[in-house]
Amino acid sequence: MVHEYKLIEVEEAHSLRDRIDILDDAYYVDRSVISLNQGLNGEIGSYYSIHDGSLPKDIRNELYEIAPKKDLPLTEVVINRYRIGDWIPPHEDDVGPAYCSTLHLEDSEEGLSYEGGLSKNKAGWCKEFPMNFVHWVEPVSDPRYSVIFLYGRGI
């Protein structure tokens, strides 16, 4: 159910991560307060994100350039930032975008959990899954970032 493939080289992923890591906290939205991502049982997770309209132009342009090419238009790019203890509850994103591809910027024994498995993070690799797919992020033990490419929002 999760399709994985290499999108960019590890060095490029790490370089992008390093540039994102120095962004001021003011760029981020606290997703436990704004644009809540509620779980299947109403839980509220804890993590931060930046939507593409708030990103510095050079980073935004780079993300749009490296985005996987799909049959639906790329309509939004979001960066999720996870600090130690941050998490996202089990949920399905069945509204808004029709399709999602997630790029990881570092290697981790942690990753995307879903019914039936765990897909570990690999720097430079993408995970793709349908939006009605139940998935979550367990409380993280190491800080990390994910770039979320959303396709077909509003179609």
Give residue ranges: language-model regions.
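Catalytic core of non-heme Fe(II) oxygenases with the double-stranded beta-helix
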Residues: 68-155
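Non-heme Fe(II)/2-oxoglutarate
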Residues: 1-70
